[in-house]
């Protein structure tokens, strides 16, 4: 790894992603300094064996130790060896900042006079699986515990509920995995309501010796969130057996569905009767970084108000302890038809649809370009009944939009954090004009994407066949029509671009000056984008590349001169021979636009 010292001037150490250090000697000689997480799996004794067998030099080990100690000294770890608890702040300035960040990241994709909301509306239907419980943050390592969560339904009720009659329906479920047990319906014992009793047994020598117990309630029990961290992580973990138990009292009669999967073996019992066997015959699944078993489900016809004894048995086998336990009771109403009835009764509909942290997370890819479950059907049906429908997309990435031709307004909100609902309410009511721009291209079909022809590859290896044509450059070069291009984003006002002037400055700098005027009636911000096109057409190089942008806030009828400065790197290419950036002389075009496709101004010059 000479590049880290010679090219990057980097004097830190290299750490693996969690569980990614799959080899011993190859990683050691390839520049890895630290395998994570502990305890060591492919290093430790195996690395010592590599040194003893002369496959890894002691000098290599010394260099790794030296780099780790250097960082420890640099961060003053030796002066303060104690592990301090994590901390964060929750105060008014930070809440305001989080709300502003959420607002400015939301992208208005389409608007045919439904937004901002008409203040004279008498009734609004808020429909969709993400309206009451939105996804505010991604799954896996992206997940953080927030101080509070603001969701669209509650935020809109708080903002306009006194003047507008609001009706709500979930419309449909979007589970990838069945939800957590209803905490109000379970109890470990009379003194421990709302939780499972979790018992750990040591099965060595043929017995079941209770070694620890705790009370917990969640659907996903795994080591990365503290499950069994002081028990199964020890050397005796192959002998550990875990039992989850509780009394469950349904509040509805009917077919209940249950689900389990784990890293290891698991089974699900009700009143001693086995409902799910994921123990005797397991298959690989995609959960827990594709280390767990495939999901298995079972059903039971349960009676309202009758108490049942639930027991889940788990035997750890694998990289780290993890098990998922889900339960879905039958719906008390027909959610789909309830939503359609509301759509008939109201002046306007706000639909909040999307994904969740099970669909969009680290460790596995989405398997479908569509919205999960019945959401596309729900959108179509609601719009057919009430064309005055605003669609809010609560997703972390692009989705297929088969209904886009008939929906009038669409907002892409992403996973906007703990102020999500409040930020969305400000956008919808017009307190804030949207100003976000797409950081990626939204394709029409999955077949249009650059990775489609090479994904998923073979034996976990995939070639990046698009080479330099990453992202919007692929669609640009291949002349592929997009649903919404990179950089796209509307406002409640209009902006006029004019007077592009290009000047060469000293130190290989290029000045791009132009004027933007707010020609509408709303105050708003515009993100102008500067693309550079080298006027030499080749099959392998992009048509143009984004090299600068500017965000400008303008009051109605206000105009400002914008200047974007481009440096030498904007006109350079990486030289494999020189191992450095090399300025390419010749003819260039500067394009100024509101997106990668919506180019407003262009000018040519020679460098």
State the predicted function of each range:
Residues 252, 264, 318, 432, ...:
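Short, acidic/polar linear motifs in exposed loop/turn regions
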Residues 39-42, 49-51, 55-138, 144-217, ...:
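Secreted, periplasmic, or luminal enzymes acting at the cell surface/secretory milieu
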């Amino acid at each position: 790894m000479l590049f880290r010292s010679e090219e990057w001037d980097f004097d830190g150490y290299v750490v693996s992603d969690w569980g990614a250090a799959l080899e011993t000697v190859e990683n050691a000689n390839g520049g890895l300094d630290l395998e994570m997480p502990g305890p060591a799996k492919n290093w430790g004794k195996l690395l010592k064996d590599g040194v003893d067998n002369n496959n890894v030099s002691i000098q290599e080990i010394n260099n790794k130790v030296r780099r780790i100690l250097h960082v420890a000294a640099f961060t003053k770890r030796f002066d303060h060896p104690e592990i301090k608890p994590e901390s964060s702040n929750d105060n008014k300035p930070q809440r305001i900042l989080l709300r502003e960040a959420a607002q400015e990241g939301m992208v208005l994709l389409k608007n045919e006079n439904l937004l901002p909301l008409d203040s004279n509306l008498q009734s609004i239907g808020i429909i969709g699986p993400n309206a009451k419980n939105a996804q505010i943050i991604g799954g896996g390592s992206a997940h953080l515990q927030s101080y509070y969560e603001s969701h669209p339904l509650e935020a809109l009720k708080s903002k306009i509920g006194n003047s507008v009659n609001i009706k709500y329906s979930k419309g449909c479920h979007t589970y990838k995995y069945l939800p957590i047990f209803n905490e109000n319906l379970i109890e470990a014992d009379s003194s421990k309501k709302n939780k499972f009793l979790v018992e750990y047994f040591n099965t060595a020598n043929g017995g079941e010796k209770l070694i620890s117990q705790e009370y917990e309630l969640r659907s996903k029990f795994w080591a990365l969130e503290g499950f069994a961290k002081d028990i199964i992580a020890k050397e005796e973990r192959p002998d550990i057996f875990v039992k989850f138990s509780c009394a469950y009292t349904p509040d509805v009669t009917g077919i209940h569905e249950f689900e389990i999967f784990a890293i290891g073996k698991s089974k699900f019992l009700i009143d001693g009767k086995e409902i799910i066997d994921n123990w005797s015959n397991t298959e690989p699944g995609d959960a827990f970084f594709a280390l767990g078993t495939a999901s298995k489900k079972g059903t039971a016809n349960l009676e309202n108000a009758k108490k049942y004894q639930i027991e889940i048995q788990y035997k750890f086998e694998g990289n780290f302890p993890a098990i998922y336990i889900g339960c879905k009771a039958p719906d008390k109403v027909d959610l789909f038809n309830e939503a359609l009835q509301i759509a008939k009764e109201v002046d306007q509909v706000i639909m909040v649809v999307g994904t969740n942290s099970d669909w969009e997370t680290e460790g596995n890819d989405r398997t479908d370009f569509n919205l999960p479950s019945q959401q596309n059907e729900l959108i179509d049906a609601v719009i057919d009944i009430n064309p005055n429908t605003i669609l809010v997309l609560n997703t972390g990435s692009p989705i297929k939009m088969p209904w886009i031709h008939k929906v009038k307004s669409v907002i892409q909100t992403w996973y906007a954090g703990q102020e999500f609902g409040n930020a969305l309410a400000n956008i919808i009511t017009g307190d804030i004009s949207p100003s976000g721009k797409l950081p990626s291209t939204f394709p029409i079909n999955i077949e249009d994407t650059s990775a489609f022809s090479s994904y998923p590859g073979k034996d976990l290896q995939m070639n990046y066949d698009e080479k330099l044509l990453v992202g919007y450059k692929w669609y640009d070069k291949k002349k592929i029509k997009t649903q919404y291009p990179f950089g796209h984003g509307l406002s409640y006002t209009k902006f006029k671009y004019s007077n592009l002037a290009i000047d060469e400055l000293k130190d290989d700098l290029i000045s791009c000056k132009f004027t933007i005027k707010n020609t509408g009636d709303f105050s708003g911000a515009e993100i102008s984008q500067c693309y550079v096109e080298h006027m030499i057409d080749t099959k392998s190089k992009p048509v143009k590349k984004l090299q600068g942008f500017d965000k400008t806030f303008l009051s109605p009828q206000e105009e400002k001169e914008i200047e974007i400065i481009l440096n030498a790197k904007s006109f350079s290419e990486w030289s494999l021979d020189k191992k450095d950036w090399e300025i390419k002389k010749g003819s260039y075009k500067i394009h100024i636009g509101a997106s990668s496709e919506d180019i407003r101004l262009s000018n040519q010059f020679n460098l």
